[in-house]
């Protein structure tokens, strides 16, 4: 089983997500990540990947996979904020040293 860690930024974003159906889908995708099923994931850059959830606004969860053992959920957003979210995820990864 893969260990999943989350930043405070990601946890707050998910807790404040008003779209309950999307929140449930994101939580299900995270459970699948734990089992090793990454599904629709795209490499963005600098080791950061984008987990795409096709629900509501088209949500994205940005993560860093460390040797397939630990996945760190950095931040998230929707298709509209994608460009800024990628920059934020890369900065968080550098800040965390991952």
Predicted segment positions?
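Arg/Lys-rich, positively charged N-terminal/basic patches that mediate binding to nucleic acids
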Residues: 1-21
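Enriched for short, Lys/Arg-rich terminal
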Residues: 3-4, 23, 38, 56-60, ...
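Internal, well-ordered alpha-helical scaffold/interface segments
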Residues: 8, 24, 28-31
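Conserved catalytic core of Hanks-type protein kinase domains
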Residues: 16, 32, 64-66
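Membrane-interface junctions
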Residues: 16, 54-57
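A short, surface-exposed loop/turn module that caps and links secondary-structure elements
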Residues: 28-54
